[in-house]
Amino acid sequence: MILLPDENWRWVFDEQRQSLLLDLSDDMQFVVSVPPKQLAQKQAFTEHFSLDDSSLYFHFLECLGEFPFTDPERVQIVLNAVAAVKYTRPLVSQSWYYRDVDMLSGEPELGEVFSVVTEFTYGDVMIISPGSNASLCIVISQAIQLDADKSLRQSSVCKLMNSKLLPYQAATQYLSKMA
């Protein structure tokens, strides 16, 4: 079941837990996966889930429509994406982990899904804030192994140079050449 935003939803930063939460009702809260070090604001606040938030929520849900996620997984990724767009501070690209595929002509679109390739694996990301040279992304794969010791889990937020983004439709052909 897909959750539908309503006027009671509120973003809350819990100083004690150092966590951003989405208060969905009196007895249900969603803990956002964005780590405190990536948040722009780290003091207590409460803010309504806005119309812009709802618009992003439904746009991202639509963009993930063709992917084989369960409804809870889809909602989790999308809520984390909306929170990241709204509350993350500017991130530095860590593109050195990813192979340069240089297959993108132009700027990626909001919600567009791309594959990325590292020395260890490949995975999929969704654009949550497009840029002309680099874009803010959310990991939609279960995980992306960056090196022997570091990986990004699903719903992790990262900034990538656009030259690292492999159009999703071209990924199968590109990856078969690597094998």
UniProtKB/Swiss-Prot annotation:
Keywords: Cell cycle, Cell division, Cytoplasm, Septation. Pfam families: ZapC_C, ZapC_N. It comes from the Bacteria. Its main location: cytoplasm. It is found in: Cytoplasm. One of its GO terms (cellular component) is cytoplasm. InterPro entries: ZapC (IPR009809), ZapC_C (IPR048372), ZapC_N (IPR048373). One of its GO terms (biological process) is division septum assembly. Contributes to the efficiency of the cell division process by stabilizing the polymeric form of the cell division protein FtsZ. Acts by promoting interactions between FtsZ protofilaments and suppressing the GTPase activity of FtsZ. Interacts directly with FtsZ. Belongs to the ZapC family. This is Cell division protein ZapC. The lineage of its organism: Bacteria, Pseudomonadati, Pseudomonadota, Gammaproteobacteria, Aeromonadales. The gene is zapC.
